[in-house]
């Protein structure tokens, strides 16, 4: 597949400068083969060591597609069904006993969970706090049983992004296989796909080199300061993946091209609309977002964000093209940059506006006299309250 390498590298280098990014790795695959890979900037500020395509980064929520894949593999092995009630697999979670939440609802974030304060109470192996309550999936069950909260909607009715839902999927996986989540991922994903520079959590970091340190902008806004990885075992199934852009590209290529990789159905099945965006071409499947473009093209993708980490992985099935990005600072615009890379390869095949990110807002979507009904106080146990006014 033809592309202008000089133009692509100008795009990536420009992003480094524009968004004050310390280090960035990128990889593009076509038909499962690498056609572009590179690194820009620093992976370690104290040693001035540079990023390359084999540098390992935390990729946060991109972990979710791995967790979803294992659940679908388990369904193919006939040891669960995604239509099973979650309460059948986690009977000790009392808040689920009167609900009809199924595994498929956890996969596409439609279980109805509100924002919960779980991450503020979870054990960080690098930064233990006195009020830490949760290290394991079983600890999560105990915590949720004590927490007073109301569900947002009936299962399947509303997308409400929930890390806790993916923690519960991790709990189900460990109970199904009677093994740690780390062991199951290694046996069912890393080893079969030969993802040789991927692992879960930081406990295996000592066996690898070339790991990017997470950074944040210093007080003077001119320098970068190292921070610790957030290493919370409870969230391993929601965001614990450490990997390279090469391994990420290979993973999404297998999922996208084969469609299942030993799973019962593609991860794009069981989708629900993302109603926070202003048209119906955006949806969420099982650990993947799904964008309907034009000419019957479909982009499957996900991002990851947490302190010191920004990532993107995407796959365009019709062109068998994958893009992976990793950055060692939070809040980098990886979704926008990932789409801009796709544009360089697609040329005139897809209307550029279809790959725009964030999506273009339709100013006529709401009449001015409708806006008042959205004012008021909003909030959650996870993020606190905020006021919306005209």
Language-model region placement:
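Active-site SXXK
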Residues: 7-13, 26, 32, 58-84, ...
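Short, well-ordered beta-strand elements
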Residues: 35, 312-329
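Short, glycine/proline-biased beta-turn/loop segments that scaffold the active-site neighborhood
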Residues: 81-96, 193
């Amino acid at each position: 597949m033809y592309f202008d390498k000089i133009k692509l590298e100008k795009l990536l280098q420009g992003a480094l400068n524009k968004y004050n990014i310390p280090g960035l790795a990128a990889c593009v695959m076509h038909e499962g083969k690498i056609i572009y890979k590179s690194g820009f900037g620093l992976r370690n500020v104290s040693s001035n060591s540079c990023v390359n395509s084999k540098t390992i980064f935390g990729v946060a929520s991109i972990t979710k597609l791995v967790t979803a894949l294992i659940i679908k593999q388990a369904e193919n092995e006939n040891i669960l069904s995604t239509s099973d009630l979650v309460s059948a697999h986690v009977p000790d979670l009392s808040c689920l006993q009167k609900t009809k939440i199924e595994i498929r609802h956890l996969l596409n974030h439609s279980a109805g969970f509100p924002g919960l304060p779980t991450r503020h109470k979870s054990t960080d192996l690098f930064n233990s706090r006195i009020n830490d309550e949760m290290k394991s999936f079983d600890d999560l069950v105990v915590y949720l049983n004590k927490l007073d909260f109301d569900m947002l909607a009936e299962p399947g009715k509303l997308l409400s992004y929930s890390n806790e839902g993916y923690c519960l999927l991790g709990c189900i996986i460990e109970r199904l296989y009677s093994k740690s989540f780390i062991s199951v991922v290694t046996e069912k994903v890393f080893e079969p796909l030969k993802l040789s520079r991927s692992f879960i959590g930081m406990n295996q970091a000592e066996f690898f080199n070339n790991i990017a340190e997470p950074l944040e902008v210093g007080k003077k806004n001119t320098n970068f300061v190292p921070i610790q990885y957030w290493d919370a075992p409870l969230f391993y199934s929601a965001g614990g993946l450490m990997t390279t852009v090469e391994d990420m590209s290979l993973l999404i290529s297998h999922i996208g091209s084969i469609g299942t990789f030993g799973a019962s159905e593609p991860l794009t099945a069981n989708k629900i609309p993302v109603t926070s965006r202003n048209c119906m071409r955006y949806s969420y499947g099982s650990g993947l977002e799904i964008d309907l473009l034009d000419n019957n093209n479909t982009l499957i993708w996900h991002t990851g964000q947490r302190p010191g980490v920004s990532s993107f992985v995407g796959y365009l099935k019709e062109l068998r093209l994958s893009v992976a990005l990793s950055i060692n600072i939070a809040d980098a615009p990886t979704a926008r940059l990932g789409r801009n890379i796709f544009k360089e390869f697609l040329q005139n095949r897809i209307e550029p506006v279809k790959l725009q990110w964030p999506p273009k807002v339709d100013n006529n979507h709401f009449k001015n006299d409708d806006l008042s009904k959205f004012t008021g106080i909003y909030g959650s146990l996870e993020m606190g309250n905020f006021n919306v006014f005209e």
